[in-house]
Amino acid sequence: MAANPIKTGATIDGFLVGELLHKGGMASLRAVTRPDITVPLLMKIPTMLEGDDPAAIVGFEMEQMILPRLSGIHVPKFVAAGDFSGPPYIVMERIAGQTLLRRLDDLPLPYAEVAAIGAKVALALDDLHRQHVVHLDVKPSNIVMREGTGDAALVDFGLARHDQLPDLLGEEFRVPYGTAPYMAPEQILGDRRDPRSDLFALGVLLYFFSTGVRPFGDPKGKRRLQRRLWRDPVPPRKRRADFPPWLQEIVLRCLEVDPVHRHPTAAQLAFDLAHPLETKLTGRSERMKRDPIGAVIQRRFHPDFAFAARRQAAAPRVSASSTAPIVAVAIDLAEGSEPLHEALRATVQRILETLPDARFACLNVLKHHRIAIDTTLDEEGRSKHLTRLVELKQWAQPLAALQNRITFHVLESTDPAAAILEYAQTNRVDHIVMGARASSTLRTLLGSVSQEVVAKAACTVTVVRLPRAFDAGAGESPPATR
């Protein structure tokens, strides 16, 4: 699709597009109406321009998967969505109320008000966590206080993780995603599974709203982000002499590096914020200065191995002999590959019949030049990444039996084989299925992607070849790239 083609006055799937309400780096928000719906509606439309991060597309896809599964007053009600084969969008309830971003000019807020806001946000997080979702981007602009009731509602689930859905962001990208001031240490290290990451972010918000200062600033780059793993923040009582010990106890507990030392649940955090006199005080409540430099050096160069061990133990492990393996299917989308496509689909179908609980990940590599400058849009202004994603989904349409057990990933790399191998290793893939190049002198001299994957993969690899009758016209494109 072309970049952001939806304009005021357009009709999309029965929705009349109204005024532009907000335009951000990754998406725009527009008011929409439909004759059969009387409540105010909001349409979220991804922005895809030259040079945009493909993670924005994947994040939008995740939000389309997660939002329909959520319910209750603490999230916007899902109405409809348009997939990537046409103009992609999400239509949801337009919540009446203001985001906490509007309160920044009033900081620092009274302590009682900070605690009241924090308790409401913690209750919203508890409701979200009970629905199997970690938000992973809790910040003032993503929290709306509903008019009338004052309940907190969480918005923007582009970085969220649902523990019953594939984590497309975590599988496809190796860099941490989030908003720098609010990211939890484990999130920076690539762990997106822990609900207590949201409690850390809420702790940052509580510190900020009660002191007017962000505890870790607004760091740029991963190295500066990682400082919070070993450098503790200035205690709030150092910044404000009248800061209540009970509130410092709660805030610094939220900001513990190891999640095990934070509140076990958002509900317990909400209880403490609502009952300050019942909060059990520890040494945290008395701190007036940061840890001495010796302790910082110890944490920096001799980290808490128990923390690392717990994170490693929590990592999902799937044995190659499991009855529910992860199968990666590397697909060449070049024109003229339909006979090979049919053979690949037939192979996938046989695996599905043998292992009905298998999960499939369809891969395609968008190959970048090693020296030349690549563009993210094609000659018609469409996102190359998005076009490949749509083509992958079209490839899988005949495999109707897969439905919710198949995901789609466009990898971007100068080396297709390396990209496939890295994906397989990172995501503990048990079986790779891919097509082979047609026989040729060039393939003999330079080798092939399939040969490299077979030689280096740590899992089973099935290479699908066409009978020689098809080989002559099969082309020279490597698997999973073009």
Tell what function each PLM region has.
Residues 47-69:
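AlphaC helix of the eukaryotic protein kinase fold
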Residues 320-375, 482:
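Small/aliphatic-rich secondary-structure junction motif
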Residues 123-133:
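Protein kinase catalytic-loop region centered on the HRD/HxD motif
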Residues 431-456, 470-471:
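Glycine-rich, Arg-bearing micro-motifs that act as flexible, cationic patches
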Residues 117-118:
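Activation segment signature within eukaryotic-like protein kinase domains
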Residues 85-99:
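Conserved short submotifs of the Hanks-type protein kinase catalytic core
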Residues 81:
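Activation-segment/catalytic-loop signature of the eukaryotic protein kinase fold
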